[in-house]
Amino acid sequence: MPEALQELAAHVQMRQPDAILGHRVEFGELTLDVVPNRIVGLVEFLRSDASCRFSSLVDITAIDHPERPARFDVVYHFLSMYQNQRIRLKMQVREDETVASIHSVHPSANWFEREVFDMFGILFTGHPDLRRILTDYGFRGHPMRKDFPTTGYTEVRYDEVQKRVVYEPVKLVQEYRQFDFLSPWEGADYILPGDDKART
C-alpha cells in the first residue's frame, strides 16, 4: 500500500505542482501539504481525475497551534471508493486569513465548514451560509482554540422561576486547583497517629 500511495502522491504532484508543498506517508496514510489559495482547484482535480476519483469528502477539521504565525492547520479527509484509497490535505493558515470554501465541489462541505468556523473561528469565503452550527447564536469565542477558557465565558441554564433559559457570567464556587501528580505524598507509607493496624 505505501508504494501505491507514493505513486498517487507523485501523480498529484506532477499534475498539480503549484498546489502541493510536499507530501508524506505515515501509518499507511498519505498527507499532502497544500498551498491555501489552491485548495478548490486541487479538490476539483482529486475528484475528477481518473487516477484519483476522490468523490467522498469524509471530514474537515482544524488543529490550533497558537505558537506558530500560521496558527491553524485546516485538514480535509477524502475517500476514493473506486481506488480504495484515502487522502488527507493539510494547509496552514494565519488567524486573519480566510479559506476558500469547497462547497461548490463537495456540497457536503457545508456543515463541515460551519463546524470549523464555529469551533475555531476560521472564515470560509464563498460559503452559502457560514453561521454557527454547534454553539448558541450569542456564543462568545471559539471553544476548540487552545486559548479558550475551559469554563467558557457564560453559563447557560434553565431557570425554574422564570421558566426560560438564562445566560449568566460564570461563577466558580471553588477556584481551580492545580494537582501535583508527582507529589512525594503519593504512594508513601506514612503511619498516622492512632493507626494501630499499620504498625502490625
UniProtKB/Swiss-Prot annotation:
Q: Which gene encodes it?
A: nuoC
Q: GO molecular-function annotation terms?
A: NADH dehydrogenase (ubiquinone) activity; NADH:ubiquinone reductase (non-electrogenic) activity; quinone binding
UniProt-listed NCBIfam families: NuoC_fam, PRK06074.1-5
Query: What domain of life does the UniProt record list for this protein's source?
Result: Bacteria
Name recorded for this polypeptide: NADH-quinone oxidoreductase subunit C
| Membrane-protein topology | Peripheral membrane protein
A Pfam family reported for this protein in Swiss-Prot or TrEMBL = Complex1_30kDa
Q: What does this protein do?
A: NDH-1 shuttles electrons from NADH, via FMN and iron-sulfur (Fe-S) centers, to quinones in the respiratory chain. The immediate electron acceptor for the enzyme in this species is believed to be ubiquinone. Couples the redox reaction to proton translocation (for every two electrons transferred, four hydrogen ions are translocated across the cytoplasmic membrane), and thus conserves the redox energy in a proton gradient.
Location(s) in or outside the cell: Cell inner membrane
Assembly, per entry: NDH-1 is composed of 14 different subunits. Subunits NuoB, C, D, E, F, and G constitute the peripheral sector of the complex.
E.C. no: 7.1.1.-
Q: Which organism is it from?
A: Cereibacter sphaeroides (strain KD131 / KCTC 12085)
Q: Which reaction does it catalyse?
A: a quinone + NADH + 5 H(+)(in) = a quinol + NAD(+) + 4 H(+)(out)
Q: What family does this belong to?
A: Belongs to the complex I 30 kDa subunit family.
